[in-house]
Regions:
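Hydrophobic alpha-helix immediately C-terminal to the catalytic Tyr-X-X-X-Lys motif of short-chain
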Residues: 155, 159, 163, 195, ...
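Short, surface-exposed alpha-helical segments at coil->helix boundaries
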Residues: 38-41, 157, 193, 252, ...
Length: 342
């Protein structure tokens, strides 16, 4: 069975590619390498059933040809990262909305099962304690470009469900809540790799806002486990499902944990948002907590990796990338005190 993964050279897509190959699927990755990189697929190239196609989901001819050769499609290609979205609002909208339309249209033509990756950003400013999939989207004003991402991904969800109801397309939509792990790039504003990179270099760890805002991080291998199970679940077709952790951590606490685990001398510096994003267009949420009752009910899934373990595993990759001397990290000599799982 062949799986087409759009955006498969990216952070999550490359991990999914490896997992599917290990489970004896054939995998085709379509990626324009705008934010992904071939290095992420280094292990995938070792498998005879792997194919990489450099190209864009905006190229309808290429997309249709690859969908025709595939038994399932996982649509991960998207504009990602706060910095990228703020700098490229038009490209964000076009890639996310038009690219998803092209993929869904090809999948509907061939009747190919499809999983569309969405985001917790679609909940916007909703302040509910635990966000269920049917919770309202409370999006900010059009004058703030950061909302172009959330709005475009919400339209992707509408498109997916419309293709399901109109054309009978077997489609699943997943909403990711802050997936982290090896291969996540710091350059697009992703918080954990930025903290880790600064700590390893002994540079200031910059915490935006007041540091009391919280997020719920999910390790990439837990996310991949959920995706694989959903692809094998006919009951999940036509559904939207959260993939995330119910356990919160503040950004200041996260920075402190990274500093402690690395054994870094870095200072933690609080940076107000107007200094972090002087060009404007940014607005942050105080907290965003997923309800995972639905996905647990459908496939029995819940994340198992603690925050400290996520940090350690991500540090190990960054450590190798920066070619720092072995034994530098504090966690190599003594185990960290694990965060309480509330």
């Amino acid at each position: 069975m062949r799986v087409l993964i759009t955006g498969g050279a990216g952070f999550i897509g490359s991990h999914l590619s490896e997992r599917m190959l290990r489970e004896a699927y054939q995998v085709t990755v379509l990626d324009d390498l705008s934010t992904g990189c071939v290095e992420n697929l280094r292990r995938a190239f070792d498998y005879p059933g792997f194919e990489f196609v450099e190209g864009s989901v905006l190229d309808a001819t290429v997309v249709r040809r690859l969908v025709a050769q595939s038994d399932m499609v996982v649509h991960m290609a998207a504009a990602v990262g706060v910095r990228y979205v703020l700098d490229h609002p038009l490209a964000t909208i076009r890639t996310n909305v038009e690219g998803t339309h092209i993929v869904l249209d090809a999948c509907a033509h061939f009747g190919t099962k499809t999983l569309v990756a969405s985001t917790s950003e679609v909940y916007g400013k909703n302040v509910s304690d635990a966000l269920c999939e049917n919770a309202d989207s409370v999006l900010g004003p059009s004058s703030l470009s950061r909302w172009s991402y959330a709005t475009s991904k919400k339209l992707d969800e509408f498109q997916a469900l419309a293709y399901a109801s109109t054309h009978g397309l077997p489609v699943i939509v997943t909403r990711f809540f802050n997936i982290v792990g090896p291969r996540q790039a710091a350059r697009y504003g992703m918080v954990l790799p930025n903290f880790i990179q600064a700590a390893l270099k002994g540079e200031p760890i910059r915490v935006f806002g007041d540091g009391r805002q919280t997020r719920n991080f999910t390790y990439v291998s837990d996310c991949i486990d959920a995706l694989v199970r959903l692809l094998r679940s006919p009951e999940a077709e036509g559904e939207i499902l959260n993939i995330g952790s119910p356990h919160e951590i503040s950004m200041l606490n996260l920075a402190e944990r990274v500093k402690s685990i690395v054994g870094s001398s870095s200072q933690i510096v609080i940076v107000p948002y107007d200094q972090a994003y002087p060009e404007g267009g940014f607005e942050d949420m105080r907290r965003r907590v997923p309800c995972i009752c639905k996905i647990s009910r459908f496939i029995g899934w819940s994340p198992t990796t603690s925050v400290d373990e996520m940090i350690i595993r991500t540090i190990d990759q960054a450590h190798k990338r920066l070619a720092l001397p072995a034994g530098l990290l504090a966690h190599e000599s003594s185990p960290p005190a694990l965060l309480p799982q509330r």
